[in-house]
Amino acid sequence: MKIFVGNVDGADTTPEELAALFAPYGTVMSCAVMKQFAFVHMRENAGAVRAIEALHGHELRPGRALVVEMSRPRPLNTWKIFVGNVSAACTSQELRSLFERRGRVIECDVVKDYAFVHMEKEADAKAAIAQLNGKEVKGKRINVELSTKGQKKGPGLAIQSGDKTKKPGAGDTAFPGTGGFSATFDYQQAFGNSTGGFDGQARQPTPPFFGRDRSPLRRSPPRASYVAPLTAQPATYRAQPSVSLGAAYRAQPSASLGVGYRTQPMTAQAASYRAQPSVSLGAPYRGQLASPSSQSAAASSLGPYGGAQPSASALSSYGGQPAAASSLNSYGAQGSSLASYGNQPSSYGAQAASSYGVRAAASSYNTQGAANSLGSYGAQAASYGAQSAASSLAYGAQAASYNAQPSASYNAQSAPYAAQQAASYSSQPAAYVAQPATAAAYASQPAAYAAQATTPMAGSYGAQPVVQTQLNSYGAQASMGLSGSYGAQSAAAATGSYGAAAAYGAQPSATLAAPYRTQSSASLAASYAAQQHPQAAASYRGQPGNAYDGTGQPSAAYLSMSQGVVANANSTPPPYERTRLSPPRASYDDPYKKAVAMSKRYGSDRRLAELSDYRRLSESQLSFRRSPTKSSLDYRRLPDAHSDYARYSGSYNDYLRAAQMHSGYQRRM
């Protein structure tokens, strides 16, 4: 007969000791001791009954009363209940009696701090779970739930409760409030095949989230940060929403000019044109005080600008179109009227009726407040050529600056310029109607001029490299090169015109730093090729190189506009700051140089906090302050550095590192 002996301490109870205990009652065939119970096989049925009667409750060890009963094969379908967080003071008998009040208990096994109770009926098991879950037993709240492991099937307990190698998958029963660990934890399997080998509390499964993110060393930095640091553009671009770049820059929150310029070579101008419906060259020049969308298509003054110029939107003209396209035509090759922008004498002075000169340029240009005229005039040679920085700020007060212009017509216009203030345009539609040449072009649009809002286009014209925009035209243009405008114009004049508060309206310090910094200062072809749609790049590349250089425009003019950053005038600066992590600029043919260069880049005392790329990866440098690179374990070993001492002395000097290390450095073993 098979006798179950419960509450046995398997650690200090041997099968021989147990067999000797049962021997007086009959022949003991075998004895198997598990961790907390044992099975004794006796030959005679009567001897087994006598042993059960005599030894049930017997204390084999002080304080451990044996549970001796006939081993019963478990019914084929029992309901297995997992009981977690069982107090060490709670015996299987006590637990069994607790559950037996709710129904018949087939089996109750306590393993360390959890137990399994097998009940005969499902209803009883569910009632027991409902009533006992969270109940305090011997000072600990037990966690009771239906075991998710399939019910044990088999004739006896001994075979099923063996294998000590099966450890619980997880489950910290010290936290009963977790509502059970049934889904992830296999206490059942743990106990089902094992009541042995549990030397510690079962561990709860690793949660699906991870407290620590991927190492920042492996995380790719966001691409945008490499385009151009946000600081490349003046804070005014980022901070001021009213800059009339408006839609263009406000729409791209990172607003790094690098991004803006890379996609739209003509920069914000394209965007601002894209945003305005009438989107004609006229619109920006005609009323730069107007917000781009306030001019209707009817108000488009393409006629006044070139008469012959197609109504192609400035978007295309500024965007990526070839040099011959509409705007470039209008600026570069177009006859007298739009040569106006390159050959300013003709355009401003003796300009055709359809142009600005005779049309009382006062009215047409003065419409633009100082802010908006900025962009358009800043690019036009004659108008700014002799002008001082102060003169570029307000056209209303600039009789003198216009007198100095080469065109005779400006001397005549000094009175209208002096007389009219930028503000006066909103109130003088008559000025437009009365102009001689405005009949076709402007006379029909007084409302458009009068009603235009005061948001200047200045942002779009000033902020974008105005040069870029009209450069084409200037490169291909006739006699009057840029020299008047950009070359002769003092640095102060240029900066004033671009960055003075009046010029930009709301942006006091918005020098062209960012726009110009993103393109190289001297070579037009290089700067355009680097940041333009291919076809436009081709057209720019094809145009005379003297666009910037030959016209006598010194790089100083640009450098003074806080473009000192661009040291190398002939190469486009890299879109992100080079660091010691950047690949070498050129391959080193000399192996000594290569080894030394690599050892410098991967030297073991370089802290990540000193490498600006990693600084950019993290909000705070503190996370990297204590994590030096471990070059001794680094997989990027130096190349073949063993041929002579001079070659590897630079890279192997971490053996002598202690003399060089600063005190804050922690050697990581």
Curated annotation (Swiss-Prot):
GO cellular component: cytoplasm; nucleolus; nucleus
Biased composition (Low complexity): 287-303
Modified residues (N6-acetyllysine): K164
Modified residues (Phosphoserine): 161, 220, 242, 244, 256, 272, 280, 520, 523, 527, 562, 582, 618, 620, 623, 627, 643, 649
UniProt keyword RNA-binding, yes or no: yes
Annotated ranges, domain RRM: 1-73, 79-149
Record's keyword terms, sorted: Acetylation, Cytoplasm, Immunity, Innate immunity, Isopeptide bond, Nucleus, Phosphoprotein, Repeat, RNA-binding, Transcription, Transcription regulation, Ubl conjugation
Annotated SMART domains: RRM
GO molecular function, one term: mRNA binding
Role noted for this protein: May function as a nuclear receptor coactivator, enhancing transcription through other coactivators such as NCOA6 and CITED1. Regulates centriole biogenesis by suppressing the formation of aberrant centriolar protein complexes in the cytoplasm and thus preserving mitotic spindle integrity. Prevents the formation of the STIL-CPAP complex (which can induce the formation of aberrant centriolar protein complexes) by interfering with the interaction of STIL with CPAP.
Residues with PTM Phosphothreonine: T206, T572
Protein name, UniProt field: RNA-binding protein 14
Subcellular location: Nucleus; Nucleus, Nucleolus; Cytoplasm
InterPro entries given in the database record: Nucleotide-bd_a/b_plait_sf, RBD_domain_sf, RBM14_RRM1, RBM14_RRM2, RRM_dom, SRSF
Main location: nucleus
Cross-link (Glycyl lysine isopeptide (Lys-Gly) (interchain with G-Cter in SUMO2)): K126, K135, K138, K149, K153, K164, K600
Assembly behavior: Interacts with NCOA6, CITED1 and XRCC5/KU86. Interacts with SS18. Interacts with STIL and interferes with its interaction with CPAP. Interacts with gamma-tubulin. Part of the HDP-RNP complex composed of at least HEXIM1, PRKDC, XRCC5, XRCC6, paraspeckle proteins (SFPQ, NONO, PSPC1, RBM14, and MATR3) and NEAT1 RNA.
Key word Magnesium present: no
